[in-house]
Amino acid sequence: MAVKIRLARCGRKKRPFYRMVVADERYARDGRFIEKVGTYNPLVNPAEVVVAKDRVEHWLGQGAQATRTVKSILKKEGVAVS
């Protein structure tokens, strides 16, 4: 089971809001997930990000891979991502 930290789209048409989730890579983008570790709202200026840093670090320590977009968000929030 390859685990990824990625963004799941929520919100409505033309008004995206994202949940940062830990999920098996085989699951659909907006489908099942293991744990919600944060949120990302790109519509406000500056973008609003809420991250449970301890849980993200836990999952990264367990071998989860962050997607490219999530890596850039986490770097801006000060979470060490390899």
Curated annotation (Swiss-Prot):
The keyword Acetylation does not apply. PROSITE patterns: RIBOSOMAL_S16. Belongs to the bacterial ribosomal protein bS16 family. Keywords: Ribonucleoprotein, Ribosomal protein. InterPro entries: Ribosomal_bS16 (IPR000307), Ribosomal_bS16_CS (IPR020592), Ribosomal_bS16_dom_sf (IPR023803). GO terms for molecular function: structural constituent of ribosome. One of its GO terms (biological process) is translation. Gene3D superfamilies: 3.30.1320.10. The gene is rpsP. Pfam families: Ribosomal_S16. This is Small ribosomal subunit protein bS16. GO terms for cellular component: cytoplasm; small ribosomal subunit.
